[in-house]
């Protein structure tokens, strides 16, 4: 029978995982406490937290959320989880930048909005701009052709109005001169 402390720890991990929209798994072997504190300080403003976990307990918790996914590969060796509660791409960028400075931080993979990604895929996702920028680019790409269409459709009508206005002014001049 499991100890109550372990059951409570699994429940805490489960709640954190459930509330996060992304989980990034890393290996931290060789990093000092000061290094990890510095990393936590970089991602905290991005609405994320970095926690070292016990593999067996984390695996029990994550299986409650993703029972059909093969996640055991992420829980081999020393493991830390970055819980992202906000924009995961900003956090990924911060983690990748930190890993460039501290080569001992290694990516194992991640789960972003329910999809499982390998370590290489996580690094590639870090190159994407934030969600708001992507959305504005999509809106811009959609609205530009629509604006052109509106102007194209309005142009003949505007031209007709200007022509009729010019004719009316010309007739007005003629009637004044008579």
Swiss-Prot record:
Keyword Ribonucleoprotein appears in the UniProt entry: yes
Keyword Secreted listed: no
Biological process annotations from GO: translation
SUPFAM superfamilies: Ribosomal protein L10-like
Keywords, comma-separated and alphabetical: Ribonucleoprotein, Ribosomal protein, RNA-binding, rRNA-binding
Extent of the signal sequence: none
GO MF annotation: an example: large ribosomal subunit rRNA binding
InterPro entries (UniProt xref): Ribosomal_uL10, Ribosomal_uL10-like_sf, Ribosomal_uL10_bac, Ribosomal_uL10_bac_type
Pfam families referenced in this protein's UniProt entry, alphabetically: Ribosomal_L10
A GO-annotated cellular component: ribonucleoprotein complex
Function: Forms part of the ribosomal stalk, playing a central role in the interaction of the ribosome with GTP-bound translation factors.
Subunit details: Part of the ribosomal stalk of the 50S ribosomal subunit. The N-terminus interacts with L11 and the large rRNA to form the base of the stalk. The C-terminus forms an elongated spine to which L12 dimers bind in a sequential fashion forming a multimeric L10(L12)X complex.
Family: Belongs to the universal ribosomal protein uL10 family.
Protein name in UniProt: Large ribosomal subunit protein uL10
Organism: Dictyoglomus thermophilum (strain ATCC 35947 / DSM 3960 / H-6-12)
Gene name as annotated: rplJ
